[in-house]
Amino acid sequence: MSASPDDLSTGGRLQNMTVDECFQSRNTVLQGQPFGGVPTVLCLNIALWVLVLVVYSFLRKAAWDYGRLALLIHNDSLTSLIYGEQSEKTSPSETSLEMERRDKGFCSWFFNSITMKDEDLINKCGDDARIYIVFQYHLIIFVLIICIPSLGIILPINYTGSVLDWSSHFARTTIVNVSTESKLLWLHSLLSFFYFITNFMFMAHHCLGFAPRNSQKVTRTLMITYVPKDIEDPELIIKHFHEAYPGSVVTRVHFCYDVRNLIDLDDQRRHAMRGRLFYTAKAKKTGKVMIRIHPCARLCFCKCWTCFKEVDAEQYYSELEEQLTDEFNAELNRVPLKRLDLIFVTFQDSRMAKRVRKDYKYVQCGVQPQQSSVTTIVKSYYWRVTMAPHPKDIIWKHLSVRRFFWWARFIAINTFLFFLFFFLTTPAIIMNTIDMYNVTRPIEKLQNPIVTQFFPSVMLWGFTVILPLIVYFSAFLEAHWTRSSQNLVMVHKCYIFLVFMVVILPSMGLTSLDVFLRWLFDIYYLEQASIRFQCVFLPDNGAFFVNYVITAALLGTGMELLRLGSLFCYSTRLFFSRSEPERVNIRKNQAIDFQFGREYAWMMNVFSVVMAYSITCPIIVPFGLLYLCMKHLTDRYNMYYSFAPTKLNEQIHMAAVSQAIFAPLLGLFWMLFFSILRLGSLHAITIFSLSTLLIAMVIAFVGIFLGKLRMVADYEPEEEEIQTVFDMEPSSTSSTPTSLLYVATVLQEPELNLTPASSPARHTYGTMNNQPEEGEEESGLRGFARELDSAQFQEGLELEGQNQYH
């Protein structure tokens, strides 16, 4: 295939122009070496990945303990929790015992992660883990399929072009090397649409595997807001529904209160109680224990300072517990005065709840609901009625944040994030700013691809990890009422910010703040808009993202195993702890759930990068496959060994499906931009690209809409609906677990027996009732420690047994 002189001159002129316009600073980090430095970055990442595995194997082996209880009580190693087996999180099944027997070699954990059966992982981690790994299977098979046309069709077409000279090794693998007169460009457009259709079919097949959960269909309870706070008699609410909706039977009415301070005091009180019990049991065996209670006591070994004086541990925690208990009781007495305008109303069956909900569906549009004789008292025309979430899904501390203040906080936080990320701190802008201040001049003089290519790809990966953490933690500041809504917002926010930070803005050459602002507000600069879109097809740009995917696949997944952030936070908290019970609590609280929302967002970000450049730079596809395989293995290990079982709303998984459907649309957009800029807006390929993009968008939106309709249909209760304890009649709930009531846990839990001898875990370790007193004391100490450290395990059993979700 030959190219005309115009093509050759245009190619050279285009490359020189776009390099100057896209990268206006000296830019050590955004311009590449021969073949984009890809081989060097790949080899260096492989070496670092092997090093990370070796380091992790040493750390994990050093902290290994199958008993786990003795490790938590007696081992102060900084790595004991982070890298040890989280055996307290799940019941010791035959599968777990078999895995422990096999997990004794230096790198046996690595091979166990590969050979582990899906059934073992699902039995331990729950149904959400099944949906997650099946989703990864679909992506892996899809990318494996598109590797064939990408490497077998598109790559040879690109490389055999003659627009660029033979010295441009990496550039010849991109679409820039194909002549504008070549009919083979039709294959690029056709395959971009084929990728979308294939991906859509895979996602549709994945959605069919979502089994409807009873926990989402069993609710007969409504959540009602804007109820007058002066209503204290539930009979008024019952009377209103009885008169306004004849035949409706209300079985339970729960009022809500502001319990933020009460929950905090209860946590502190329980920590003090655990400290007293621990040192009481220990004093009976070893005598009085002295501790230094200053947070910085570990920094100073001198006992002469007053603030570092040692005190009697048992007496200190007894006095602290007494003080906090008094404050707790005082706050508990004030709680009835802190009524919220929110109630939960449970009906006899779901049809009654559905009838009321339907009547209030259009209240905001001015449609009046049915009235009763007490309507003017309960002000039912102001109510907002929705189906109640599961009690375990509610974050009770956040219910006191009213909707107006909630929206004000939500808008303020996300506006700040928008300006922070879009205008100031996208990874490429940070890296380009480093260049502007001559920080990288010594690196530039080296002219070494190890530094000039590996360094920027590591920086880009690092910023795409650090910056979304800010987004991740911002979701907690927004004070969502339910964990499901919190996770759903988290997965969407992280993905949107990541795609703009990593894919869209850097691809268009918006790599410095001044260029970005000029692109937004300068009228004359906008006349050169075509130059910005040429940046998408700059060869160095493609190499930059190939290196990013390689780094995410190897070094990135290796760092997910190390979890240095968790280790740093844990070691810092442990360093400033004052006593052994506090360290026990720190270890217990460190056992967190697997963050599906965050992992979905990061995985979909890399998948979007791969799909965006799968046509214009096909060499990125096999590295995308490498990333998905490495991510799958890493997540299997982390879910099984490192995190607690997690229950989710299925909307989280559907959000990831929507993002996966959106990813190939970026490739269609990129193909359309190329056609407009290189072929003209009236060229047949341009018109075809625009048509396929519009068709793909329609298919995507229709598919997502039908998926939501299916979820709504699954949500609707069936005629023979399974009855759950929190929907039963009051007379039938005498033994109802308190965690299943629509009342904050801190208001309903019975008082604990505060003596170690009565600990329910006392005989967990096979202790005998007729043992000597010393044995009883030792058993009580160990049993109490087991009680302290098994909270996450008990929670996991409760959730698994009741098929609930967080």
Swiss-Prot record:
One annotated Gene Ontology cellular component of this protein: endoplasmic reticulum membrane
One GO MF term attached to the UniProt entry: osmolarity-sensing monoatomic cation channel activity
Functional summary from the UniProt entry: Acts as an osmosensitive cation channel preferentially activated upon hypotonic stress. In contrast to TMEM63B, does not show phospholipid scramblase activity. Enriched in mitochondria-ER contact sites where it may regulate the metabolite flux and organelles' morphologies in response to osmotic changes. In particular may regulate mitochondrial motility and function in motor neuron axons. Required for the functional integrity of the kidney glomerular filtration barrier.
Subcellular location: Endoplasmic reticulum membrane; Cell membrane
Record bears the keyword Membrane: yes
InterPro entries attached to this UniProt entry: Csc1-like, CSC1/OSCA1-like_7TM, CSC1/OSCA1-like_cyt, Csc1/OSCA1-like_N
Region (Disordered): 755-781
Reaction(s) this enzyme catalyzes, per UniProt: Ca(2+)(in) = Ca(2+)(out)
GO biological process terms on file: glomerular filtration; monoatomic cation transport
Summary of activators and inhibitors of this protein: Activated by hyperosmotic shock after mannitol treatment.
Keyword match Ion transport: yes
Keyword tags: Calcium, Cell membrane, Disease variant, Endoplasmic reticulum, Hereditary spastic paraplegia, Ion channel, Ion transport, Membrane, Neurodegeneration, Phosphoprotein, Transmembrane, Transmembrane helix, Transport
Reported tissue expression: Expressed in podocytes of kidney glomeruli. Significantly reduced expression in patients with focal segmental glomerulosclerosis.
Subunit description: Monomer.
The encoding gene: TMEM63C
Associated disorder: Spastic paraplegia 87, autosomal recessive: A form of spastic paraplegia, a neurodegenerative disorder characterized by a slow, gradual, progressive weakness and spasticity of the lower limbs. Rate of progression and the severity of symptoms are quite variable. Initial symptoms may include difficulty with balance, weakness and stiffness in the legs, muscle spasms, and dragging the toes when walking. In some forms of the disorder, bladder symptoms (such as incontinence) may appear, or the weakness and stiffness may spread to other parts of the body.
Membrane-spanning segments: 38-62, 127-159, 183-207, 404-433, 449-478, 483-519, 543-575, 596-614, 618-642, 650-678, 684-704
Cytoplasmic-side segments: 63-126, 208-403, 479-482, 576-595, 643-649, 705-806
Phosphoserine: residues carrying this PTM: S77, S80
Family: Belongs to the CSC1 (TC 1.A.17) family.
Protein name per the record: Osmosensitive cation channel TMEM63C
Pfam families attached to this UniProt entry: PHM7_cyt, RSN1_7TM, RSN1_TM
Residue spans, topological domain Extracellular: 1-37, 160-182, 434-448, 520-542, 615-617, 679-683
Membrane topology term: Multi-pass membrane protein
Organism: Homo sapiens (Human)
